[in-house]
């Protein structure tokens, strides 16, 4: 392992995804961030939630560890009957976006399980809806754009 310390630690690393088929090699988000900070000398490392099926929809993680919706994208959480869940109730993540115009990708029901924690009250200070991704539906097909195996 080679440690590369950047001369200027004001950079920000944004990372996301890539563990679907390589789940046995997966490390926690916290461990990954700490390793990047240690090896590169960066102070800010943020995860994001997004998918190739809805290009342009990127939900950035705040410093409190939550993903935030933007002006251009939103999420809904649905139960097993596809009814809307209440805040702080886990269910399937449905992503909504204004960005896709060349294909019908404005609304995608994912196989990811998530929970909306609140709206306009995240401790990071950012307004809007914020949420967590808890995992995937059991027995869902493990695939994704980042799979290389």
Task: Give the location of each predicted region.
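Active-site glycine/GP-rich loop and adjacent strand/helix microenvironment
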Residues: 1-149
């Amino acid at each position: 392992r080679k440690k590369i310390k950047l001369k200027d630690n004001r950079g920000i690393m944004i990372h996301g995804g890539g563990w679907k088929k390589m789940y046995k090699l997966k490390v926690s988000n916290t461990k990954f961030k700490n390793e990047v900070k240690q090896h590169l000398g960066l102070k800010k490392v943020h995860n994001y939630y997004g998918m190739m099926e809805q290009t342009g929809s990127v939900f950035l993680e705040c410093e409190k560890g939550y993903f935030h919706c933007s002006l251009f994208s939103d999420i809904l959480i649905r139960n097993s009957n596809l009814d809307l869940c209440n805040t702080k109730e886990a269910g399937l993540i449905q992503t909504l976006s204004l960005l896709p115009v060349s294909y019908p990708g404005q609304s995608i029901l994912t196989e990811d399980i998530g929970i909306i924690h609140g709206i306009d009250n995240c401790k990071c200070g950012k307004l809007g809806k914020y949420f967590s991704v808890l995992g995937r539906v059991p027995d869902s097909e493990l695939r994704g754009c980042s799979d290389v195996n």
